[in-house]
Amino acid sequence: MPLNLPDKLPAIELLKEENIFVIDNSRATQQDIRPLRIVILNLMPLKITTETDLVRLLSNTPLQVEISFMKIKSHTSKNTPIEHMKTFYTDFDKMREDRYDGMIITGAPVEQMEFEEVNYWDEITEIFDWARTHVTSTLYICWAAQAGLYHHYGIPKYALDKKMFGIFKHRTLLPLHPIFRGFDDEFYVPHSRHTEVRKEDILKVPELTLLSESDDSGVYMVVARGGREFFVTGHSEYSPLTLDTEYRRDVSKGLPIEIPRNYYVNDDPDKGPLVRWRGHANLLFSNWLNYFVYQETPYNIEDIR
């Protein structure tokens, strides 16, 4: 089944060019099934890029998925046209009475600040709490994973000596967990962050289960509440050139940045990236949608509690 997206969302045409099947609302209303309702709280600066990355992965499923985009009132995006935000994004205040089968909360470029110093901290923690009673399963990504673990479970974050930047090998700790259906024993994930959460802190909290880690990049995936919360520290959703764009941006600004590890062919930026995380990324999102959203959500969406 295709994704059901808002009419005229830029991602529609971009993904059609990649031969990915998507439909707009007008076509979806002719299909007599209840689609899964997924809300995305997109905190990344380049909204359209992140929308496209996530929608690309959510399309890899036999389920019809209806996507909505949430925004917070206490922060104004400086890198996305105002008209785009007005057209496709809705304030949390206007969505708080709604319920959703799944939610994705993205990373944000605020990780080097203390959580409480982030200007939208009060609002986003209200959203974290709201999701527990209005969403069947929530997927927290990168900074959102750190923030969610801190808010719900008191897990601290720690500054790294240098940026964790590149593609890193990971292993599953519970290979029979449904989120890992189809995974290889080892798989690769992009990371781009200045902070981390640590294994020893996760293991102290009985409500948390560590699912995956890396010798190089540490904690990768944590689950709580029987799959109603997933915390993922990497960026499986990244497109092939995202790390390249970040690297060249920082070089042009004269910032201290190393070549992303295990990313370019022969570590040569001129040769482009070697993509080895695409298969894992598609499995991660399709398994989450199937086993923790579709299989768990009630048919009557108002029954979500």
From Swiss-Prot:
Its main location: cytoplasm. The keyword 4Fe-4S does not apply. GO terms for molecular function: homoserine O-acetyltransferase activity; homoserine O-succinyltransferase activity. Pathway: Amino-acid biosynthesis; L-methionine biosynthesis via de novo pathway; O-acetyl-L-homoserine from L-homoserine: step 1/1. The record marks 111 as: Important for acyl-CoA specificity. The active site is at 142 (acyl-thioester intermediate), 235 (proton acceptor), 237. GO terms for biological process: L-methionine biosynthetic process from homoserine via O-succinyl-L-homoserine and cystathionine. GO terms for cellular component: cytoplasm. InterPro entries: Class_I_gatase-like, HST_MetA, MetA_family. Substrate binds at residues 163, 192, 249. Keywords: Acyltransferase, Amino-acid biosynthesis, Cytoplasm, Methionine biosynthesis, Transferase. Transfers an acetyl group from acetyl-CoA to L-homoserine, forming acetyl-L-homoserine. PANTHER family: HOMOSERINE O-SUCCINYLTRANSFERASE (PTHR20919:SF0). Belongs to the MetA family. This is Homoserine O-acetyltransferase. It comes from Bacteroides fragilis (strain ATCC 25285 / DSM 2151 / CCUG 4856 / JCM 11019 / LMG 10263 / NCTC 9343 / Onslow / VPI 2553 / EN-2).
